[in-house]
């Protein structure tokens, strides 16, 4: 079973806690993006990233000086969003770390697909960024089928990614792949389930931690997940 999750906007550098094991598998494609991003001025970058001046200036400086092979942070520790705080990888046991290295994949607009111990640099580039160039019509067009090709989950994919990121993978999966997309929410009446954004992010991180602690790759184990209250799952 392979697990996919989204990245987070906020990132940090941590080159001391754990050593990186590898470079991202799609780094040549990342270099193409980096060359383009280095050619943008701050106003153009602000528009592309849909951010304020401060974030645009920060990422302009990042892209201008970025070395994709030095001063790297393991991807699993580089992201600081709610999902990652509830996953709490910094306190994983060695067995749990090996589990996520084998089963967990982080989707990224800049790097494509990341294993937990792939080395990364802080960046801002979301999958929904309106990147239109002479080599692509969008981020989804740029990555195409590349992300799906790198997922090898023995026929089962646990989708813990947002719609923005799962869209880069699900349409390109080969026939026969079972996709499990959990729904984390509360019933509002007899039929409707309401998902709350913050709660969903918390639950996704907790589910990764639960599976890593259990060390299981069996989809049936998901029925035992009971952290943060009830969870339901939908299988496509």
Residues of each region from the PLM?
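Short polar catalytic/cofactor-binding loops
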Residues: 7-13
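Extreme N-terminal starter segment of soluble prokaryotic enzymes
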Residues: 1-3
